[in-house]
Amino acid sequence: MIYSSTEIGSRIAPVAKEFDVKKMILFGSYARGEASEESDIDFLYQHEGSKVKGLISVERFRQALEQALGKRVDLISMESLDVAYNQEHRKFIVDGIRSNKEIVFG
């Protein structure tokens, strides 16, 4: 199934609330309108002030999102962009997100 951004927002809202995540931004193929049945769903999320702290809670959050959507999910925290591997890597990620993004929660 290929979801609209509105459907994605509706499905992830309970999960985001459960984990106290304040904002989730859709990017990648779904944000560009190029998703296929095999596409994963890419999110940038704000973890500051949330219950998503540490590797185990990030994995629980990702699994809860995957269960809500029935699709694989990739996550990048907004805060992690500040410590990206190097400036070139950070620029690549940020430019890709900036050019095709949609706030779906928060």
Predicted regions and their residues:
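Catalytic core of pol beta-like nucleotidyltransferases
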Residues: 1-23, 32-33, 37, 48-106
